[in-house]
Amino acid sequence: MKILKVKCLAPTRLDNYLMQQFPALNPGRLNKALRENKIKLNGKKQPLSTRVMAGDEIKLFILDDVLDADKRVDGPAWKNARGPAQVVYDCPQILIVNKPAGLAVDGPDDDTLLNRALLYLNQQGEYKENDVYTPALCHRLDTGTSGLVIIAKTPEAEELFLAAIKSREVKKTYLCVTFGRPTPPDATLGGYLLKDADRGIVKIVEDKQPGAKDVETRYETIAVSGRLALLKVQLITGRTHQIRAHMASIGCPILGDSKYGNNTANRELKLKYQALCAWELTMPHFNQPDFEFLSGKTFHAPKPWYYQQVLDGMLK
């Protein structure tokens, strides 16, 4: 967030004033920001045609990398990432990084998890923009989900881990908080997952349908606090939005989930992202000499903020 104290002598339109202060802004970006309640004049949402005067206060809830886009460094996108990735494990073959909630793994923006990883590798002297191979994501996480992501540093690692993840050899365990206590407290959920491409969501159905894929999720209740439950969840299959949709299908959606969750509770608790963390990765046995040292290793992300709050009964 940026706070501006208006100092202009003559009354000036709000949009013109902001474009003078931040040349990277344009009418399209300003209108989008206003629709999303990201511009407040003296604490209130006001039309962009409103005249601002000396002494007025403007609050902008717009990312700094958008406001400062005119200061962008020439070159590849990773040079403009907001900082290096948080590294959990680094070896000659792979990088395991901890993704914060709200950061996309990749995409058109400069500041993505992959670009932060490339920036880290460049700072370590392991990657340059003209290298033949560019390190690559081996799997993905939803933007609102935090936790561990594997990045291949070599073509051989990329091929091996893409195959191992596709064949479900890499075990993935998550931590999450649900709105509602699941019954029974420990269970394995089955069914089929069906995508609704028009709405950008998935749903769980009991019977096989055209286009539906089998889905299996195992959960274990760690603790409960009021209306909430802290769970450890293992993905047996690995489908789009699997945990989010599966828990919602039994009446216990992930807290903070805007697609499948209880938005009244999300607003009450002021949660912006789903309380879901890719907490643990366990490697399979590798026969390849260059990867044998990784066999059976387990890696953990730091426990998310809500973990201890549920244990202590502060979040309920």
For each feature predicted by the language model, list its residue ranges:
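RNA pseudouridine synthases
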Residues: 1-197, 302-311
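Pseudouridine synthases involved in rRNA/tRNA modification
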Residues: 1-32, 64, 80-85, 201-203, ...
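Short alpha-helix capping/helix-loop boundary micro-motifs
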Residues: 42-48, 227-230, 267-268
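Short, surface-exposed secondary-structure edge patches
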Residues: 47-51, 232, 273
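Short beta-strand micro-motifs in enzyme catalytic cores
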Residues: 95, 174, 229-231, 277-279
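A short beta-turn/loop motif at secondary-structure boundaries
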Residues: 140-143, 211, 223-225
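Phosphate-binding site of ATP-dependent enzymes
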Residues: 175, 182, 222, 226-228
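Long C-terminal interaction/binding lobes of large macromolecular proteins
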Residues: 219
